[in-house]
């Protein structure tokens, strides 16, 4: 009781804040109680009031309700996300209770510097912006304290990269009270999803809280489950690669004798080399569990390279064979054949020449076989990649800090 009045006196002089009642009544009779501020024991009582309340052998239980109002600026390349939260903390401090029969006030508000409040630190935060620099705590007549803290923060997130850009990730926010021990303080956390806007690439589809066990420092953890719903990434990454692969397959329909085929294939390969560099740069990377698209784009590059090499080799062999046929001994003139009594080719030989001319050379036959095998290989690649995408899973190695609770030495 005396600690409460000491806080009230300090509030009037040090902070110049008017105490408000639930029903809107102002504090009266201040002139009569001001002389007590010069009491010698005042500083001791004030110091006692800003210490953690004693709950006997049990730790003080602080109920925390986390209201998530927005998640934005999710950057998977930087492994960061921004969020806006409202923390509603409540606990019991019997030192602040008063008798309503003597002092008919149901509730008062106090600046949080004048009483004990849990000092929270977000472990994953790069920066934290507390929206209210001087929040007010509401104290009920029975000593229940309620404090609302609004904040915006940017935190690190361990994104799931394997299935990017259709990834599902769990991002955690760990709140620690570093000025207290687990024997003094305990959190009971709840989370509420108040996000009303879904026009984001990443959508929060689930929230959960937990209190990690075996911690020397009291803490609670809020986990946000994010789902990537962006269609832009799929169009920007997959459509150009698939279009070039389809164009390469269609290029196999050109005859091997066509001069344009080699230029067509080489142009596609060079175009995909430039595209491959930009595609890989647009994908996130990690020491483990890299996106499957990195391997997929590399396989497409190998397919285009193999197709181009096949065209160049077989076209070169075909041109060399034609050049050898042209440089062979030329047949004797028709006049000389008649002089030697050779009446010329038999009429039955003419159809045989036509049949022989319609037959394909072995490079062209090999090209047709390669084309069929290449088409089958491309289709199999698509189906195999789809199966791997659906059933593949990858678990990264545990970080060194996750091998032991906070404040302990890692296990060897």
Swiss-Prot record:
Expressed in which tissues: Detected in pancreas, brain, liver, placenta, trachea, kidney, spinal cord, stomach and fetal brain. In the adult brain region expression is detected in the hippocampus, striatum, amygdala and thalamus.
Protein name: Ligand-gated cation channel ZACN
Biased composition (Basic and acidic residues): 335-353
Primary location: membrane
Classification via Gene3D superfamilies: Neurotransmitter-gated ion-channel ligand-binding domain, Neurotransmitter-gated ion-channel transmembrane domain
CDD domains: LGIC_ECD_ZAC
Annotated signal sequence range: 1-25
Extracellular domain ranges by topology: 26-233, 287-298, 390-412
Transmembrane feature ranges: 234-254, 266-286, 299-319, 369-389
